[in-house]
Amino acid sequence: MIQMQSMLDVADNSGARSVMCIKVLGGSHRRYAGVGDIIKVSIKEAIPRGKVKKGDVYNAVVVRTRKGVRRQDGSLIRFDRNAAVLLNNQHQPIGTRIFGPVTRELRNDKFMKIVSLAPEVL
């Protein structure tokens, strides 16, 4: 459950380390984002010589949340940290590698590129 001012880890090799959610996209009064939702983020920490720099604003898709994802069979998949993958304006990932597991729900949300790059799909 991600809202404005939430801090997230970055799960790709774009050069960003942590980002802050500045807007949840998809509706004028939408408050929360979950796994598979697109948010607007600001880069708060970045490595030198990365593809992005501190202060830049990007779209991102949420790939892991502490709140978790409820499955149809009643199981709940939750993670230790909130994480996102940075996207360009065409909603394609900026990085070429994905770190850590992602959930199968991303497959339904047209993020097959992220699912195929991820080392593990839960």
Curated annotation (Swiss-Prot):
One of the GO BP terms on file: translation
Domain of life: Bacteria
Family annotation (Gene3D superfamilies): Ribosomal protein L14 (2.40.150.20)
Pfam families: Ribosomal_L14
GO CC annotations on file: cytosolic large ribosomal subunit
PROSITE patterns in the cross-refs: RIBOSOMAL_L14
Keywords linked to the UniProt accession: Ribonucleoprotein, Ribosomal protein, RNA-binding, rRNA-binding
Presence of keyword RNA-binding: yes
CDD domains, A to Z: Ribosomal_uL14
Database matches in InterPro entries: Ribosomal_uL14, Ribosomal_uL14_bac-type, Ribosomal_uL14_CS, Ribosomal_uL14_sf
Keyword rRNA-binding attributed: yes
SMART domains (alphabetical): Ribosomal_L14
GO molecular function, one term: structural constituent of ribosome
Family (UniProt): Belongs to the universal ribosomal protein uL14 family.
Quaternary structure note: Part of the 50S ribosomal subunit. Forms a cluster with proteins L3 and L19. In the 70S ribosome, L14 and L19 interact and together make contacts with the 16S rRNA in bridges B5 and B8.
Role noted for this protein: Binds to 23S rRNA. Forms part of two intersubunit bridges in the 70S ribosome.
Name assigned to this protein: Large ribosomal subunit protein uL14
Organism of derivation: Tolumonas auensis (strain DSM 9187 / NBRC 110442 / TA 4)
